[in-house]
């Protein structure tokens, strides 16, 4: 009987110490991303060093959104992709030092691929660029350099501008 009491006196403190350690080991630390959107990286080529760039997103059924507001001397930037639509339509407004603005509409066609990291985190959408079209007021051409849009910060689209006149 005396041995049972001694055993229980030692078991209870040991259990109180071991229980939190076991509970912490059972819990997983999950760092979910704050946003579920990934971005398309645009790199500008040509004579845009002195220009100012504004980019608007045209969303059917809603108001336009300013994504980039008066970026001075643009060389590259990242714009988040929509994850519900099969295309994103952007309006590029390039203003030179004399105040002349040239506007182009760029349409990016893509697939939306859900990407799951953990059941505790919301799905992210990766994208595959399939086609890009543009008007040609300031933009000469757009080339898909890397079609897969994911966590990597690589240049996905290369935008070539007409030379200044």
What does each of the following model-derived ranges do?
Residues 1-27:
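Sec-dependent bacterial lipoprotein signal peptides
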Residues 2, 42, 161-165:
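Signal peptide-directed secreted proteins
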Residues 21-45:
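Bacterial Sec signal peptide processing site at the extreme N-terminus
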Residues 27-32, 78-165:
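Extracytoplasmic cysteine-anchoring/structural motifs
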Residues 36, 71-75, 86:
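Ser/Thr- and Asn-enriched, surface-exposed coil loops between beta-strands
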Residues 39, 50-54, 87-89:
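Exposed beta-strand and adjacent loop surfaces of beta-rich binding modules
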Residues 44-46, 57-61, 94-99:
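Short acidic, glycine-rich loop/turn motifs
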Residues 48-78:
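Post-signal-peptide N-terminal segment of Sec-exported extracytoplasmic proteins
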């Amino acid at each position: 009987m005396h041995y049972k009491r001694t055993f229980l006196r030692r078991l209870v403190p040991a259990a109180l110490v071991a229980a939190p350690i076991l509970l912490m080991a059972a819990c997983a630390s999950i760092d979910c991303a704050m946003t579920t959107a990934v971005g398309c990286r645009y790199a500008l080529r040509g004579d845009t060093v002195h220009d100012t760039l504004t980019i608007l997103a045209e969303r059917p059924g809603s108001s336009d959104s300013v994504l980039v507001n008066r970026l001075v001397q643009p060389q590259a930037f990242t714009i988040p992709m929509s994850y519900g639509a099969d295309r994103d339509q952007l309006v590029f407004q390039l203003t030179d030092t004399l105040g002349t603005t040239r506007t182009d509409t760029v349409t990016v066609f893509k697939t939306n691929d859900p990407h799951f990291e953990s059941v505790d985190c919301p799905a992210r959408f990766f994208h595959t660029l399939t086609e890009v079209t543009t008007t040609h007021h300031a933009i000469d051409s757009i080339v898909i350099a890397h079609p897969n849009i994911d966590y990597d910060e690589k240049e996905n689209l290369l935008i070539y501008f007409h030379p200044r006149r």
